[in-house]
């Protein structure tokens, strides 16, 4: 079965099963004009707590890049006593993996002061994503289009606050903000940007606004023969998505212009084409705008008016940096904090001093990992060219468990 058919089935099933007595969506309590919702910011992703059918609160990523609400574990869905109407097969983002899931219609997803009514949830039979390993904290699912579709939502990355507005009281552009058009296609928001490439040429690109992607700019080279790779690129693991890890190269673009914002020397990902590429091409988009760029701004997403409001945030002028060590870290699925080397870039500073894939990190700069967040170590490893970082590791060699110290000098490679 082709990717198009999988997507059609998904969209049809998710929205054909809701009764007509309730309109699916998220709604403020009566007489409330706006609601501030705090969120956790990990790797610039937005993590909020919500309950399903009066359960204890669990962690969700707020993600404009998906239409369906997702729960990553059927085990958790069973514990929540969810009703499942049928099974479904999905194609993963790598274009190869086939994922099985169950459809649970007509649920309540509640945040204090905000009610998610008649919500359909796609429950994965297995946790194919493993965001716990990537972020180092439990993440149970994703809330997508339904959260945004009726009401303007402001995201303040500086204060880690979401403001959910009643649409009738949000009638004009707020002071200090500018706006551009943001058309919705299949429940997903798109804006136009202009990139300046290595040969000096400029190219207008259609970008998916994706708060659930922790990269900066991603460009799909298969969508246009006018997209050029930068002169210097690194092969890299580009991250984890529904259906597996994505690979490709990263480099720097000299500039991205969005409205009156200009982002300079930005890190840009160029994923390898997959069987899923046909779906991307059909949307007409050339890439994705992720949270490493969005988090440098304050934005208001107004789906009903199809407007993207923006202003500079406190981190706007912070330089874009990529990992300078060569280490991609993951967390082990244990109660105590345990981090290991998931991937090692060949020829990188860590590779040159003898770090290996599978090594477990037990301390960084003399501080045990119990006192580190995974995202804080990742930020350290891309912080400053020439910075020295000492890591203590445990390595299994046959029946022998060795403790080693490695001194890494960070080097900017792009």
Give the residues covered by each predicted segment.
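Pepsin/retropepsin-fold aspartyl endopeptidases
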Residues: 20-414
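Bacterial Sec-dependent N-terminal signal peptides
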Residues: 1-26
